[in-house]
Amino acid sequence: MNLLQGKTAIVTGGSRGIGSGIVKAFIEQGANVAFTFYGTAPEEAEAEIQELKDKGVKIKSYQSNAADFEACEVLVNQVLEDFGGIDILVNNAGITKDNLLMRMSEADFDKVIAVNLKSIFNMTKAVQKVFLKQRSGNIINMSSVVGVQGNAGQANYAASKAGILGFTKSIALELGSRNIRCNAIAPGFIETEMTAKLAPEVVQGWRDSIPLKRGGTVEDIANACVFLASDMSSYITGQVLRIDGGMITA
C-alpha cells in the first residue's frame, strides 16, 4: 500500500530509534521525508539516507535543534524550499535525564522540558502558517505512558510528556475547523538501542509486567504513526493512542 503517497512529512529526531523507524515506515508508504538530527553524528543521518534513497521518493536530513525557536522557523522555510510543501509534522525529538527529585538539577529539568515539550511548541508554531494557508495538515506528537501515569525518577520527563498531551488536545480544538488534525502517541516499554544497554533481568522484568508479555518494537510505533498520518484516520483528532501492550488499561 501507499497510504502516504505524494505527502511530505517532517520528522524531528529522525536519525535513530523510534524516529528512524518512523522515517522508514513513511518512506515505504510513499511519503517524501525531511528528518532532523541534532545530538547524533551527521554520518548516521547520511547512512539512513543512503539506505532509503532508492525507494522512489525524496528524503533529506537537516541538522537542527528543535528546542531553538528560530532554528525551527529556519527549518520549516528550508523544507518548503526543498520539497515544495509540508503535509505532516511528527514531533518526535526527545531526551531523558532521569534522577530522583532530590538529586535532579535545575539544568536537567529545564533541558528535558526544552527538548521534549518546548520543541513541540516551536515546530507546531513554525508549521502552523503552512497548514493554515493550505487548510490542511496533520500533527503527531510523541508522548509516553509516563506522561499518562508518571514514574518515579522521571519527574522532568513525565512533566514534559504530560504537557504534550494537554498541548495536543488544545491544538486539535484550535485548528480542527481548518482541517488540521493533531494527535499524540504514548509508547510504553519499547525495545531500542537504549533499552539494549539495560541489564537482561531488568528488561525481562518489564516484559513480564506487560499483559502481552513483550516489549514493543520501533515498528509498532511507526505503524501507529502511519495510521495517524494517513487518511485512514481522517476523523480522528485530539486523541492519545497508547501503544503499550496493555500496560495501562484504565
Where are these regions (language model features)?
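Substrate-binding pocket helix/loop in short-chain dehydrogenase/reductase
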Residues: 100-101, 108-113, 195, 206
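Residue(s) in the substrate-gating loop at a strand-loop-helix junction
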Residues: 144
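Active-site helix of classical SDR
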Residues: 124, 160, 168
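Conserved glycine-rich Rossmann-like NAD(P)H-binding loop of the short-chain dehydrogenase/reductase
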Residues: 29-46
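Conserved glycine-rich cofactor-binding loop
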Residues: 8, 15-17
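Alpha-helical segment proximal to the catalytic Tyr-Lys
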Residues: 129, 173-177, 234
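Short, small/polar-rich loop/turn modules that mediate ligand/substrate recognition or access, typified
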Residues: 176, 181, 236-238, 244
